[in-house]
């Protein structure tokens, strides 16, 4: 797996939180991706990677799916 190098993007505020929570819990990106797809979120591995790297915008419904997949509240993803 490729590790992040250089600066992160600035297109969303939840991406870094998703990445940090996932890493802290030892969840592989492919496992989070599978969980999101089981919940009904249509997202590719590339799109999830860009979301975590803050290189793409996040839709409001995606925040809901991400929170459910990580078993946290949407507020936890949105609070700074």
Where would I find each of the regions flagged by the language model?
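Residue-level signal for the short linker/turn that defines the boundary of a DNA-recognition helix
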Residues: 13-16, 27, 31, 43, ...
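Short, contiguous strand/loop micro-motifs
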Residues: 5-6, 49-51
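DNA major-groove recognition helix of helix-turn-helix/homeodomain DNA-binding modules
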Residues: 55, 59-76
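A short, Lys/Arg-rich alpha-helix, primarily the initiator
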Residues: 1-25
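Short alpha-helical DNA-recognition segment
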Residues: 26-50
């Amino acid at each position: 797996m490729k590790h992040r190098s250089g600066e992160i993007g600035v297109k969303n505020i939840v991406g870094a939180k998703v990445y940090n929570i996932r890493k802290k819990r030892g969840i592989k990106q492919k496992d989070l991706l599978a969980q999101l797809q089981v919940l009904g979120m249509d997202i590719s591995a590339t799109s999830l990677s860009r979301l975590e790297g803050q290189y793409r915008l996040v839709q409001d419904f995606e925040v809901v799916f991400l929170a459910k997949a990580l078993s946290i509240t949407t507020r936890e993803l949105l609070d700074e």
